[in-house]
Amino acid sequence: MLNLVLFGPPGAGKGTQSDFIVSKYNLFQLSTGDILRQEIKNKSEVGLKIQKIINSGNLVSDDTVDRLVENIISDKKYKSRIIFDGYPRNLSQAKALDELLIKYKQKIDLALNLMTQLETIKKRISGRFSCSKCGKIYNKFFNLPSTKNDCCSKKSLIKRDDDNVDVAIKRFETYKKQTEPVLDFYKKKKLLKEVNGESSIDKTYKEISDIIDLIEA
């Protein structure tokens, strides 16, 4: 049983590492980014508002996100086996999450912070694109699709509107201002562990796995 929070600025690789952690430790990935994008895809009233906010580099309101998160926490099949990716983003959300978990007789067991510099973030975000068919994510600086890959051909590759340098910088600055106090919140609870987000995907995952294995031992 493990509830884990994964921190790091946009582009730090939280989604990639979450996928690995979910697979190895049989956790449910609660990605607020995925939840919000689904609302946008559905073109609901809230989804259209979310689209404008994200494109401008700002964050969605706490109340909206908290309601979506509670829908997952309240589901018994996910009890004490959730990895929170992209939430909580600020101190208000962190306190709200604690209250929600207590309400459903759960707690946070570990908080991981992927430490990543702005220059790396700019390349990861501005160079990011994905396959419209399978959803696989690539990067023109670090990870180009194979020329032998029929699915992820040039015709099927797309780039999100908010994946550009200006938005990357604004999102990083917003993250530093609003999210870093949350790190202190978990540090005071002695739940925070820092991981080198500048390393390769495999090295970062190895470092994360070692930390989780010690907790679960």
Enumerate the predicted regions with their spans.
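Glycine-rich phosphate-binding loop of ATP-dependent small-molecule kinases
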Residues: 1-217
